[in-house]
């Protein structure tokens, strides 16, 4: 089921990257109770069975999840985050040596970077992946409004189990619902066009 949905989304990637439909896309479902999905560089996508089963996801909601992960691959977010982390660590190392800071203070600087700066970059990437993923979903003929029901289900499932948004690498579910509502006017017409016969 997940692979069938992904096979409809993959051709839509050409809108964002002309070379992407030719990538060796690979979608796997991992047997796990976790509510998660992730993407590795080059289009290797993993969806945990718990996400699908525990939240009783519809095909449209699965398309939103897979579209989101495809968007991460298209924008090379994991490579970008790795580059930012290396640059930050190098700056912290050089700065601590120049300022003759102790290892403890250098560690505090690193924790501060992770908590306050790296998470903001991650939230920006997540918001971009949500927006692009909804467009891919709509262009493939899946209802992008399922993004709202998906995140409402996630909010219900994760109630109270998250750090404050400013310390999280992902936007809070309620924030995501608001962002998705803002994107829907531009993607629902794409969905309606994809659903038209002819």
Task: Kindly give the residue locations of the regions a language model identified.
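A Zn2+-metalloprotease active-site environment signal
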Residues: 1-198
